[in-house]
Amino acid sequence: MPRTAVHSKPDDEDRPVLLVIEDDPGLQRQLKWAYEAYEVIAASDRESALAVMRDARPDVVTLDLGLPPDPDGVSEGFATLEGILAIAPHTKVVVASGHGARESARRAIALGAFDFYQKPVDIDELGFIVSRV
């Protein structure tokens, strides 16, 4: 799968920036559609996500732990979380995952995540968490 970082509406700079790190293109599109109050930037892997962090400094990040090359595990997602917080330590990261939810939630919060959301994604619930940030 090619690396991507896609802006939903780059011409509107008044909206807060939300970085969605998710390797499922369908879920990326759904989140872009659901969060019109934000300028949504989507990244599908760690490399593109960290490039966006350096360039755009998003206000909020949602992070799926199951990213390539380890989509069935959590190692790449946690490495991405650590990279995000190394670049911008005060970034509010909401981790969303279905992998070992309780253990992953504890680890994510211990590493500095703002919150944890267990998949499958409910757009309204995740939107509420993102809006709290």
What are these regions (language model features)?
Residues 99-100:
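Short, conserved "switch-loop" micro-motifs in signal-transduction and mechanochemical regulators
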Residues 103, 121-130:
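C-terminal output helix
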Residues 13, 24-47:
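Two-component/phosphorelay signaling modules centered on CheY-like receiver
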Residues 42-60, 64-68:
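Acidic, metal-coordinating helix/loop segments flanking the phosphotransfer/catalytic sites
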Residues 51, 71-90:
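Short amphipathic alpha-helix used as the core "switch/output" element in two-component signaling
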